[in-house]
Structure formats: C-alpha cells, structure tokens
Amino acid sequence: QLQFTDNIKAAVKDAEVIFLCVGTPSRPDGMVDMSYLETAGKEVCDSLAEQSVDYMITIVVKSTVPAGTNRRLYDFLKQQTRAYVQVVSNPEFLREGSAVKDCMEPDRIVVGGESPEAFRIMRRLYDPLIKREEIFMTMNWESAELTKYAANAMLASRISFMNEMTILCEGYGADIEDVRKGIGSDGRIGPAFLRAGCGFGGSCFPKDVAALEHISRAVGHENLFVNTIQTINQNQKKRFVERIEEKLGRPLAGAKIAVWGLAFKADTDDIRESPALDIIRHLLDKGVIVKATDPKAMENMKPVFKDEVEWSADPVSCAAGADAVALLTDWPQYNTLPFRKIAATMNSPILFDGRNCLHRDIMREAGFQYYPMGRPAVENALRLKHRV
C-alpha cells in the first residue's frame, strides 16, 4: 500500500489527503525560508488544476511555518484551482532519534484549520494512533502554527535557564545536577529539558527561536524573552571557551585542544547548529590547534572546517599530546574510555565536560583536572602521567 514516485502529478492523482512536508530552513537574517513550501504548493496546485474531482481534497501542512502561512496558502489554492480544497496545519513534534516512536505514540496531535469536515477527515486519519481523545486538538490555523514555535521556544528556554544557572552554581559552589533534581521534582515544572551544557543546537530549536523573534517583530513586538534565549545560548558557547583559557592559565594561541563530539546531540550525525560549530570557531580564532573526533558526525563536519582542524578516528588518539579535552557531545561510549591511558598521553590531563556526562571520581582517579558545567570541579587530581 506504499508507493514511491518523483512525479507530483502521479502522487496527487485521486488523493483525498496531500501532505506537504518540506523543509523551512532559516535565511541568513534568521527569518524562515518559505521557498520550498511555496514551490511545493504551486506544483500541487498545478497538478490539481488538471483534475476534475467531486470530493474535498485536504492539503496538510506539516512544515513549521510562520503564523498566517496556511491561511495564505488556502487563499492561493482557492483562487488557482477549481478543486474543492481545504488546508490544515498539522505541525510535527518528532524528536530526532525517536521519530518513529513519537509518530506512533503521539502525546498530542494539533490540527489547525477552519473546516469541520477537514477536522473529521484528520480525526479519521489519525484514529489508529489516538489512545486518548484529549490528545486530538483542533484550533484555527494561526494557533496551530504558533503552537509549534511556542513549544520549541519553551523547551529552548528551559535549557537556556539551566545554562544561566550554571554560572551561579560555579560562583557559589552549588551543583547544577542537585538544582535540576530539586526543581524537576516539582510537578509544576517537571524534569524534561533541564540538563545544562555548552549550548543547544539541532535543526529546530535555534531556527524556530530565531523565527519567533521575526514573527514577533512582524506585529510590532520586540520579544525580549526570545531574544534572551538566543543571547544566553551564544554566551554559553563563548563562556565555555573563555573557561578553557582561564583554567589553562595562559592565552590559548598555540594550545592543542582535543574536541570530543561534533553532533548537536548523541545518536545522530546531525551537526546543524551544533554548539561544536561555534566553539571550534572560537578556538580557531584564538589560535588554538584543534583536533576533533566524533563516532558519527565527523564526515559531516569535515567540509565545514577542512584542514583548519586535524581529524582523529577515536577519542584516545585525538587526546594524545593535547593540552586539554573539550567534550561537546554526550556520546555514551565516552563514559567507558581508558581515562588513565588517555591522561598519560596528554601534555596536561585537563578535561572540560560541556555535557556533564562523566563521573568526577573516575576523572580524579585517572589523574584529570575535570571541569564540568555548573558542578564542582576536580582540581586536585592524582598525577598519574607515568602510569598507563
């Protein structure tokens, strides 16, 4: 029952529901690039113009788009085709790495539109996935469009808030993990997206937060909250590099830094808006000799930095001869590395954990000075350079 084609006319022929699932990346100014959706909409419209059908066709926009987009698409289709067409906004809430599970077990299905008949079609379409009636939510186009942006901005704000708290934790000797558990156990807050680190990235959060800023300006509003989310995220990456310089106790020019992790998160090769992009650039700008590794994302990162960075096949060889390690992605295999062996091969066994994913006691016993984010550091490590 599943067919593949690159022919749009063949794809939409006799279709009752047509999904538009094209990308809406950021333009250089931060606004949404709508060209892919506009092209898809026009091609669907041209294909429908050649058909004569006596039933309603529902166009479902899965793409993340600014408020007002679906309404404009509906007006365009109504003018350009004789077919009876309705447009529905149905934003996706899939997490990279667990998209199939999220699709099959949704915690909410948001459907925006103005046609009760289209709502009924969408309800019937999603019926096998609806375990509780309340997860199927209908609203107007603009509400559905803003729901997607608001959700991602809210999640990004939680990360940025915790990242800002790491500064206070470091200043007062608190532990951000204890703070996280303390506030996450509050039922009004919950534990999700409260892990501090060296910044957030990926294909959604940075793009959607930037777009929400532009959407706000379009109605004459300077969204200070959204601006702050972005500012904190950028500052956290700069602060990570500044902390390396501070703890090394000298200018970074000529220092050798090993970077472990290039993907924006573990279990993916996706480097879009990865904190590693900015952190490596900051290091290079300071004259650092950067050697980098990642179990999946290295081939995607190589075209970005080319020969500005030395590429290593594994963390052990990457750290050899380094003045410090910067851990930027929480790959689980980094927890089981031979840290004593690694420490013995480094110029100075210092590790900056941008994901708080390693254990202090293990790092201390391996002879590392260890600097996590917002957690007590290990500065009295055992000197085991002579032991392998």
Spans of model-derived segments:
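Structural/interface elements that position substrates and couple domains in central-metabolism enzymes
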Residues: 1-388
